[in-house]
């Protein structure tokens, strides 16, 4: 994220910052939240709306596939991509791993766009069912989310991802523009239903607001509200939340993010 400068550069106003935060304000979920994956890093809260989900796409694997393993117990296949490792951390017949980086361009054998990675899956052609996107790619989520088509996004029922570099994005005029563009795009199809700060890193206090450097975000596609007909108000922190690093205290999401 160095191209965005630092929080000491030109800076953004408190009004601009608080306006941007409204794009991440959690809304009531049409389904109760459940936790899938480990008790620490690798576990996430998502809506309990998995019937009819046929696959999960997971850019960024590293050494954890606990979330994807939990999905296999529900018969959901996971497609994984990570060029930094040679194989999935655990073996499972419902895992499909490729040594690839997800990017905004294609280079055979190393880089592929998110749209093309998904379109390439013969197992999903001609069939119905929704998808999940679970993404933890160390800051590359921003260009990828800007690049992905609305057609591909609309195939995801649930998105759970880690946002990196928020301390730079939300305090820098260029960065906050990227943030607003990406979440305006996402909010056209999805609603944020949960936030959890990753305690791997400290928060930055800027304009009176504590900004986690890494934030877990859960979204659900807006058409799922009409299917459910119910609403479950956001509870943050949630009793199902767990610190990513067990021996460090949780980072709290302040009311600035919730109001």
What are these language model-derived features?
Residues 1-259:
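Phosphate/nucleotide-binding beta-alpha loop and adjacent structural elements of enzyme active sites
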């Amino acid at each position: 994220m160095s191209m965005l400068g630092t929080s000491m550069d030109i800076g953004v106003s408190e009004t601009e910052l608080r306006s941007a935060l409204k794009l991440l304000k959690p809304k009531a979920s049409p389904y109760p939240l459940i936790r899938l994956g480990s008790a620490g890093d690798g576990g996430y809260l998502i809506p309990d709306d998995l019937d009819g989900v046929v696959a999960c796409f997971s850019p960024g694997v590293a050494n954890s596939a606990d979330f994807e393993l939990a999905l296999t117990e529900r018969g959901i296949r996971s497609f994984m991509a990570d060029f930094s490792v040679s194989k999935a951390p655990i073996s499972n017949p419902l895992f499909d791993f490729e040594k690839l980086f997800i990017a905004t361009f294609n280079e055979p054998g190393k880089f592929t766009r998110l749209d093309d990675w998904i379109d390439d899956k013969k197992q999903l052609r001609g069939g119905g069912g929704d998808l999940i996107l679970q993404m933890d790619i160390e800051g590359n989520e921003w260009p990828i989310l800007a690049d992905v088509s609305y057609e591909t996004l609309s195939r995801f029922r649930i998105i759970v991802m880690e946002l990196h570099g928020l301390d730079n994005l939300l305090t820098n005029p260029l960065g906050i523009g990227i943030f607003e563009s990406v979440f305006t795009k996402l909010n056209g199809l999805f609603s944020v239903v949960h936030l959890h700060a990753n305690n791997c890193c400290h928060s930055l206090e800027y304009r009176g607001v504590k900004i986690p450097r890494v934030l877990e975000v859960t979204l659900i596609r807006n058409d799922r509200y009409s299917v459910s007909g119910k609403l479950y108000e956001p509870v943050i922190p949630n009793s199902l939340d767990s610190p990513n690093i067990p021996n460090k205290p949780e980072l709290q999401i302040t009311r600035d993010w919730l109001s």
